[in-house]
Curated annotation (Swiss-Prot):
GO cellular component: extracellular space
Top-rank taxon, per record: Eukaryota
GO biological process: cellular response to heat; innate immune response; response to bacterium; response to heat; response to oxidative stress
Signal sequence extent: 1-24
Transmembrane segments: none
Broad class of the protein's primary localization: secreted
Organism: Drosophila persimilis (Fruit fly)
Name of the featured protein: Protein Turandot X
Entry similarity comment: Belongs to the Turandot family.
Function: A humoral factor that may play a role in stress tolerance.
Length: 137
């Protein structure tokens, strides 16, 4: 059975269009999630409690888009260590709930806070689609 070239061309075009729309959808999802993260962590008006409460979303974003986040090797190792330590702390239960306080308390005023700042900076610096803060050079 011969399939006309025209039908094969149409099928190929359809496949390419579907693949492009899936990629565009993933880019939109990345941009939306990145915007939410930046609204929280790149905004001085957001309080520390809100930032700490959103650390799981920050970690999830990092795990979902590792290739899009460009951290120097040393920062990446530190970030991976932080993620492992944070995840471990959340799995330890006290009376059926994750432990409160501990090393995560006041996380944003510590070395981990600096690491999160580097992570956010990498989202802004290395992604040309990220709007720069007013007055930035």
């Amino acid at each position: 059975m011969k399939v006309p070239v025209f039908q094969l061309s149409c099928l190929l075009c359809l496949i390419v269009c579907l693949l492009c729309s899936v990629k565009a959808q993933k880019d939109d999802q990345y941009d939306t999630e990145k915007s939410r993260i930046l609204e929280i962590y790149n905004n001085p008006a957001v309080d520390e409690f809100t930032k700490e409460r959103n650390i799981p979303k920050l970690i999830e974003f990092y795990r979902r888009y590792p290739a899009r986040i460009q951290l120097p090797d040393a920062d990446k190792r530190q970030w991976d260590e932080f993620v492992a330590r944070y995840t471990e702390s959340q799995t330890k239960l006290v009376d059926g709930l994750p432990a409160q306080g501990g090393w995560v308390g006041s996380v944003l005023s510590s070395t981990v806070g600096n690491l999160i700042a580097k992570f956010i900076f990498s989202l802004i610096r290395y992604d040309p689609t990220t709007p720069k803060p007013t007055g930035a050079h």
